[in-house]
């Protein structure tokens, strides 16, 4: 490709709404162009990167035995109603009507459609296993689309779906796909972690996220440096506390804490460690009638240590708390006789369901709210001042330094960007949609399923967050829009420069190298700045002075300076670099 034929559109400044590095650099490098909130055109330079991603993903999916198809972007609501997701999914699911008033959805995933295909086409155990995948446009109506391709509303995703005859073979299919994901991300040259994850709205009971390590990542990744343990924050656990509770040493006392409504403020006032305080979080669950009206509300009080944060996913998995919400101020006042900030488990006006974090269950002489403004209770002890807690659970997010649940050290936390996710679904969708096959005994069985996603358009953005400097993007070879750029200096003035550039360009093309020749006639400084911003890994500069000495200049995008190379050696050098 010659630059004069290509579409190159770089900017000196990023748009004001670009927050993260990848959004700024992809916009400045002319890879994406914003059309609307969370909706971007993939410009030619950006599309080349996306096609590289698709190619490697497609190769590894095919290698893993998956078969490609394409399913519709717009899908009938009836299929989604079979699984209940048409009603249960929030506003992120874009619902539309056609001219006849029929309901449709714009696909965020395609479990329903692929299960419908399977139930129509797969009749016997002899047809299993099967693995189908697509690389297709998706849409999620994000409330706050941001960060460019990192969290857009329209995006491209690879989604695969496996069908097996039993649980054992389904989990084997899961492992085949997880291994394929590792090969994919290894080929991209990214630093990543595979971490245990919660299955969330997709369903199932076995799940891993693939996270690119980046300081700007939205997700917290928890891992143990001394073992293989790794999980996202939603799933991560610390080693369960053990040992006898310390004997009480303090008297139960109502203590004035004027204007101190947070655990941190109370700890500072009383000059005690924050971990001696206990915070009270009030939740509510509603029972609805057939019309959707609330007929009963249960109030819950959760007790956590003052320096810990509630893990909403863990709490939502507790019996009775699947659909919890935070209680309103009137609900809190009706049960506690006090506004938030001074709440505690004693002296309630109405009973609540108490749930105690397992750390709090082992505490002695702790501090909590007195259910009276400007007062807290100090010296609180289980068994003496309160009955022993009946419901104890892990309610919190882990923190760095917690003991690893495998007993192999302490936990550390780093930031990451999710680029892939694998799920073992079991029979959640096949049961809901009656997708059965006849087993070896001629009896109908529900198909065991898995689903596997990769964010095709998110992956380049994640790669940039991990690979950039003050000059621009630094693409790994496998992702670069072009792997080599040739920069002739004033070829219109020096025929030997043009001839040498054309010769090397032709040799590289013949060798199958993804090369671009910059024949735009730009000044050297502007030309170099463009390619450093765009992030092409290998640059060769060809100038008249160097040619007279039989030399050209080679510079890798990560190098701070160029290296002189003999004209006759540059082709071999590039071949060696590209094979490394």
Swiss-Prot record:
Q: Which InterPro entries match?
A: aa-tRNA-synt_IIb (IPR002314), aa-tRNA-synth_II (IPR006195), aa-tRNA-synth_II/BPL/LPL (IPR045864), Anticodon-bd (IPR004154), Anticodon-bd_dom_sf (IPR036621), Pro-tRNA-ligase_IIa (IPR002316), Pro-tRNA-synth_IIa_bac-type (IPR004500), Pro-tRNA-Synthase_IIa_type1 (IPR023717)
The listed locations are: Cytoplasm
User: Kind of enzyme, top EC level?
Assistant: ligase
What are the recorded GO MF terms, alphabetically?
Answer: aminoacyl-tRNA deacylase activity; ATP binding; proline-tRNA ligase activity
| EC number, UniProt record | 6.1.1.15
Q: Which GO biological process annotations does it have?
A: prolyl-tRNA aminoacylation
Main subcellular location = cytoplasm
GO CC terms for this protein?
cytosol
Alphabetically sorted, this entry's keywords are: Aminoacyl-tRNA synthetase, ATP-binding, Cytoplasm, Ligase, Nucleotide-binding, Protein biosynthesis
Q: Determine if ATP-binding is one of this entry's keywords.
A: yes
UniProt superkingdom: Bacteria
Give the reaction(s) catalysed. tRNA(Pro) + L-proline + ATP = L-prolyl-tRNA(Pro) + AMP + diphosphate
- Which Gene3D superfamilies does UniProt cross-reference here? Anticodon-binding domain, Bira Bifunctional Protein, Domain 2, YbaK/aminoacyl-tRNA synthetase-associated domain
Return the PANTHER family for the record. Answer: MITOCHONDRIAL RIBOSOME PROTEIN L39/PROLYL-TRNA LIGASE FAMILY MEMBER, PROLINE--TRNA LIGASE
Q: Domains: what does the record tell us?
A: Consists of three domains: the N-terminal catalytic domain, the editing domain and the C-terminal anticodon-binding domain.
Q: Which family does it belong to?
A: Belongs to the class-II aminoacyl-tRNA synthetase family. ProS type 1 subfamily.
Q: What's this chain's function? A: Catalyzes the attachment of proline to tRNA(Pro) in a two-step reaction: proline is first activated by ATP to form Pro-AMP and then transferred to the acceptor end of tRNA(Pro). As ProRS can inadvertently accommodate and process non-cognate amino acids such as alanine and cysteine, to avoid such errors it has two additional distinct editing activities against alanine. One activity is designated as 'pretransfer' editing and involves the tRNA(Pro)-independent hydrolysis of activated Ala-AMP.
Q: What is said about its interaction partners and assembly?
A: Homodimer.
Specify the protein name: Proline--tRNA ligase
Organism field:
Albidiferax ferrireducens (strain ATCC BAA-621 / DSM 15236 / T118)
């Amino acid at each position: 490709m010659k630059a004069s034929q290509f579409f190159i559109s770089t900017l000196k400044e990023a748009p004001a709404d670009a927050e993260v590095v990848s959004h700024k650099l992809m916009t400045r490098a002319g890879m994406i162009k914003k059309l609307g909130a969370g909706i971007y055109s993939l410009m030619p330079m950006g599309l080349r990167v996306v096609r590289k991603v698709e190619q490697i993903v497609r190769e590894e999916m095919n290698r893993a035995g998956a078969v490609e198809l394409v399913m519709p972007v717009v899908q009938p609501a009836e299929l989604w109603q079979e699984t209940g997701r048409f009603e249960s999914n929030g506003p992120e699911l874009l619902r539309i009507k056609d001219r006849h008033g029929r309901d449709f959805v714009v696909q965020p995933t395609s479990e329903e459609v692929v299960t419908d295909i399977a139930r129509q086409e797969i009749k016997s155990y002899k047809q299993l296993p099967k693995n189908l995948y697509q690389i297709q446009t998706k849409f999620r109506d994000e409330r706050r689309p941001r960060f460019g391709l990192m969290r857009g509303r329209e995006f491209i995703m690879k989604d695969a779906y496996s069908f097996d005859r039993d649980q054992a073979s389904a989990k084997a299919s899961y492992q085949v796909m997880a291994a394929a994901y590792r090969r994919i991300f290894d080929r991209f040259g990214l630093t990543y972690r595979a971490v245990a994850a919660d299955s969330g709205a997709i369903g199932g009971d076995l799940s891993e996220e693939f996270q690119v390590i980046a300081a700007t990542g939205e997700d917290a990744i928890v891992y143990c440096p001394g073992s293989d343990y790794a999980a996202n924050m939603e799933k991560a656990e610390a080693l369960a506390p053990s040992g006898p509770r310390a004997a009480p040493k303090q008297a139960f006392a109502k203590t004035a804490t004027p204007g101190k409504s947070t655990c941190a403020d109370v700890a500072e006032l009383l000059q005690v460690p924050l971990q001696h305080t206990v915070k009270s979080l009030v939740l509510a669950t509603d029972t609805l009638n057939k019309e959707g009206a609330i007929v009963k509300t249960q109030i819950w009080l959760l007790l956590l240590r003052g320096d810990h944060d509630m893990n909403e996913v863990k709490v939502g998995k507790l019996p009775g708390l699947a659909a919890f919400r935070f209680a309103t101020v009137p609900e809190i006042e009706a049960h506690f006789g006090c506004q938030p900030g001074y709440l505690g488990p004693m002296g309630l006006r109405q009973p609540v369901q108490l749930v105690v974090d397992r750390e709090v269950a082992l505490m002695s002489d702790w501090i909590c709210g007195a259910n009276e403004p400007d007062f807290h209770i100090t010296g609180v002890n289980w068994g003496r001042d309160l009955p022993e807690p009946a419901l104890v659970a892990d309610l919190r997010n882990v923190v760095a330094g917690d003991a690893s649940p495998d007993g192999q050290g302490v936990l550390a936390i780093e930031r990451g960007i999710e680029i892939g996710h694998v799920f073992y679904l079991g029979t959640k969708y096949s049961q809901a949609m009656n997708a059965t096959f006849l087993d070896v005994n001629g009896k109908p069985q529900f198909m065991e399923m898995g689903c596997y996603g990769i964010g095709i358009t998110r992956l380049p953005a994640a790669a940039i967050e991990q690979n950039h400097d003050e000059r621009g993007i630094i693409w790994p070879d496998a992702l670069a829009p072009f792997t080599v750029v040739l920069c002739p200096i004033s070829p219109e003035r020096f025929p030997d420069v043009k001839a040498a550039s054309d010769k090397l360009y032709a040799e590289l093309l013949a060798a199958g190298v993804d090369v671009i020749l910059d024949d735009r006639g730009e000044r050297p400084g502007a030309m170099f700045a463009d390619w450093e911003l765009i992030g092409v890994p290998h640059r060769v500069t060809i100038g008249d002075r160097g040619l007279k000495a039989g030399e050209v200049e080679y510079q890798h995008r990560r190098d701070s300076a160029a290296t002189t190379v003999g004209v006759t050696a540059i082709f071999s050098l590039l071949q060696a670099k590209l094979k490394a």
